[in-house]
From Swiss-Prot:
Enzymatic reactions: alpha-D-mannose 1-phosphate = D-mannose 6-phosphate
Function of the molecule: Involved in GDP-mannose biosynthesis which serves as the activated sugar nucleotide precursor for mannose residues in cell surface polysaccharides. This enzyme participates in synthesis of the LPS group B O antigen.
Native species: Salmonella typhimurium (strain LT2 / SGSC1412 / ATCC 700720)
Protein's UniProt name: Phosphomannomutase
Cellular localisation: Cell membrane
Free-text cofactor note: Binds 1 Mg(2+) ion per subunit.
Pathway it works in: Nucleotide-sugar biosynthesis; GDP-alpha-D-mannose biosynthesis; alpha-D-mannose 1-phosphate from D-fructose 6-phosphate: step 2/2; Bacterial outer membrane biogenesis; LPS O-antigen biosynthesis
Record-listed E.C. numbers: 5.4.2.8
Amino acid sequence: MNVVNNSRDVIYSSGIVFGTSGARGLVKDFTPQVCAAFTVSFVAVMQEHFSFDTVALAIDNRPSSYGMAQACAAALADKGVNCIFYGVVPTPALAFQSMSDNMPAIMVTGSHIPFERNGLKFYRPDGEITKHDEAAILSVEDTCSHLELKELIVSEMAAVNYISRYTSLFSTPFLKNKRIGIYEHSSAGRDLYKPLFIALGAEVVSLGRSDNFVPIDTEAVSKEDREKARSWAKEFDLDAIFSTDGDGDRPLIADEAGEWLRGDILGLLCSLALDAEAVAIPVSCNSIISSGRFFKHVKLTKIGSPYVIEAFNELSRSYSRIVGFEANGGFLLGSDICINEQNLHALPTRDAVLPAIMLLYKSRNTSISALVNELPTRYTHSDRLQGITTDKSQSLISMGRENLSNLLSYIGLENEGAISTDMTDGMRITLRDGCIVHLRASGNAPELRCYAEANLLNRAQDLVNTTLANIKKRCLL
């Protein structure tokens, strides 16, 4: 008797959907049958385009991830497909290894979303799956006859090669005399980062390791984490603090004063350090990046790494040094790039380590804050309102589409006035004074995201706080 009679029906009945990047849902809905259904459908879609006999598999530190991985591995075995399990590693480490081995991969991770949720990310042998692949996975009708959940034996190869990818770029330990704090919490890469930075010459201080899962969101850094960073920087005399989200594909980096950098500013500095010609970024990124001051071409996309990756195809026709990054800090290398006469192969998926290393390399004879202060002054801020369903978020955006004045009044900005809107992803409103407010539904969880941009940080923060406070008050009426 089949455990999964029809993978399409099992997935549909689970209520789990593809979000901004990967399939996301409640842990209780990711049953072994649902994990198996996603796995066999993914394999079927990949077999239409690629020849392979093995799939790579890895997990983050969420308590539910190992059991989900066991179900995925069991489904692969049922289909006669081998599995290499790389244990707990950052998502980009799995992606790099699987691309090097020309095989598909599955990452069990919920990234930064709340504890009670989890997810599955899928990789083709040539990188992240596309939105077209996602649709194909949801339409496949396949079966799984037997699921035997076995202990998974860990291979260290992905972790070793991920560290080597970056240490091989530098012939000298350029971080000598630098003190780097690693905010470890429950990050999937927490056991890799210390040896990586030590190999580059740094004195490393381990900070904030947690036995419980901590869903760090690099676009909505908590007040507690801001205070921690400032305290650590002072107590340990740090030159920088490095951290990531849960699965290690979004960086969180603080300067010598413990001030966390915005992800898009980090991406800009990394792109400049790499001497990039063309850049693909979501529309939510700081507008100074697309101002024409830094790059030959900037392509604006919807929010989500699949859209950034899709833009690489267009950019590669005219440019040879291509990168992409997001407001969350995740950095995507769209082409091979030579660094210190060493070739760094393209890695078209979000990565947290490359932007950190290039920022530290660029600031090796100065400070991180000095590099940031050289940029034009334009500030962004973002936060989220949790527990807001996608339907409710979309109804807010529809309100703005039908009558912008009504939306501005609803979010407490009725006296601001708007001069333009952009509907590329959600609703991005340019106000009369040139400030920007951007609302969109999260693709990963029932959350409403709010982004703001202004010439003063306090102004950007006030716009986000006012907007979300008014929405929260009205939604709870």
